[in-house]
């Protein structure tokens, strides 16, 4: 159902001055088409009103809501309909239609200790996640996530998610990397609930279908520009309607950032082109910190030459990695877990095989993932999407030949720092402080449940658990219909000025050229293995690229569906994420999880955990690296770093914290 506000219809018929010339801007939307927002069952936005306080060149509309969610992937949808279900007047702003969000690309599954394949316990899942994080994960948040996991999966089942089934009718659970029984002593766990190899697709459509039951107002194809901050509080967001070029200020008591990751900072990645770190950059521009951005996960099995994801579920179903000699080489690197070691371990092992001359193909620059020893019926029922993807992108029939694969950027462990309730935090004078009115969840956030390395199938769990946590936290502290905090009349003025500047900029370098330079710099200088000299050179190169942003050239001077402008705004966001990633990596003088330094090959904790700690002198906070990086970027692109302690305590005595130890599989 589309509708048109009276104030909105008047708005677009006003005369606008664009780029120094007066143009008559007739209404681009009529009652027969979508105007300012698209709603299936959402409330009619009677609060929308015209404003000329920040621009006489662009139509500006002000809206009031109890809560605003930015992003409509798995985390954003779960937060949005959770808020609407609790009675909050909620807006969900998204730059693309909800079911086109990148959650749709997740393949393998969602972890939960249901115990359908063997006895399982959420505390074992907790242990595996802490170990997988290389002891950089916050154990209170990991406790919350893993304890909530079984109920979250059952909730999805009740929403209608069509999980794969065992012969007994239970939810089928496959093996995934880094998952064990009995605190690592009971063998491989089967904990990953799946819908064949299209779990993300099913999850996203299930959540979107569920969301239509509630009174959520969806603002589809709206590009969020910046947070509206007043006196250290978040009071909403400002966004561009890409369909007609109008500017919208959303005033709200609570704002949830669920904008996903920033995989497109790298040249080769599994991320959609829309994964541009928009929320992460918005927080950075607001003067707030980001956390642990140097930890970037390289998925072991991206299709060679294409980067498309081949799910870890392939190895969970029995697939193996082989080198040019036909050797199952993971037996040498992870004697127990083998091909189901954690992703950082497998990616490094593959890279070493290639470096030492045992790569496959004429250039010996990749390895093979072998599936053809598995029954064709198993491939057809459990991995149908992979069979199709391998044929399209690699020309491989998986029933007869192996898939050429190479580690590819896949996930960002770092993000906007939050506590386990989803509240965004800063670190002031040695203490965590909540940013009033601001929440984050999903890949955009760092709770930190993934620490230095995420376990496969914990990401979809992260989405639903912390999307729900944001809604619950807001419902605990606020009531629907409470007065919306005020904003300054000129709030968002800088955002509109930046947009206008980019729209008419006429420098010498195209957006696409700058973007590819940034991506190749990140790919070449912050890859699977890193060294100080290469990272330092990468920092210098990236800062130089960032300094040329003022010399950028755009071509489209229009305002309706100006994709040139939107891609340039996305490049600004990517650049802020890339700068913090590479500077954080250069500063971290150790190897931990996905951050592997060849010049600092060991993990540096407060104690040497390879030996008994009795008699050891505890290192001071400044001497060890078991701490979170907090990064800031000023208006000139200068990165500054601080650090905050890892939380080692759990929520209660139901779960005992896991002390650091040597991490092996």
From Swiss-Prot:
Cofactor: FAD
Subcellular localization(s) per the UniProt record: Mitochondrion inner membrane
Membrane topology summary: Peripheral membrane protein
Residues reported in the UniProt entry to bind FAD: 72, 75, 94-95, 101, 103, 108, 224, 278, 443, 459-460
Class in the EC hierarchy, top level: oxidoreductase
Modification sites for Tele-8alpha-FAD histidine: 102
MF terms in GO: flavin adenine dinucleotide binding; succinate dehydrogenase (quinone) activity
InterPro entries the UniProt entry points to: FAD-dep_OxRdtase_2_FAD-bd, FAD/NAD-bd_sf, FRD_SDH_FAD_BS, Fum_R/Succ_DH_flav-like_C_sf, Fum_Rdtase/Succ_DH_flav-like_C, SdhA/FrdA/AprA, Succ_DH/fumarate_Rdtase_cat_sf, Succ_DH_flav_su_fwd
Residues where oxaloacetate binds: 299, 343, 410, 454, 457
Source superkingdom: Eukaryota
Active-site residue list: 343
Main location group: mitochondrion
PROSITE patterns: FRD_SDH_FAD_BINDING
Range annotated as the organelle transit peptide: 1-45
Entries under SUPFAM superfamilies matching the protein: FAD/NAD(P)-binding domain (SSF51905), Succinate dehydrogenase/fumarate reductase flavoprotein C-terminal domain (SSF46977), Succinate dehydrogenase/fumarate reductase flavoprotein, catalytic domain (SSF56425)
EC code: 1.3.5.1, 1.1.5.-
GO biological process assignments: electron transport chain; tricarboxylic acid cycle
Gene3D superfamilies assigned to the protein according to its UniProt record, in alphabetical order: FAD/NAD(P)-binding domain, Fumarate reductase/succinate dehydrogenase flavoprotein-like, C-terminal domain, succinate dehydrogenase protein domain, Succinate dehydrogenase/fumarate reductase flavoprotein, catalytic domain
Purpose: Flavoprotein (FP) subunit of succinate dehydrogenase (SDH) that is involved in complex II of the mitochondrial electron transport chain and is responsible for transferring electrons from succinate to ubiquinone (coenzyme Q). SDH also oxidizes malate to the non-canonical enol form of oxaloacetate, enol-oxaloacetate. Enol-oxaloacetate, which is a potent inhibitor of the succinate dehydrogenase activity, is further isomerized into keto-oxaloacetate.
Subunit structure, interactors included: Component of complex II composed of four subunits: a flavoprotein (FP), an iron-sulfur protein (IP), and a cytochrome b composed of a large and a small subunit.
This protein's name: Succinate dehydrogenase [ubiquinone] flavoprotein subunit, mitochondrial
Encoding gene per record: sdha
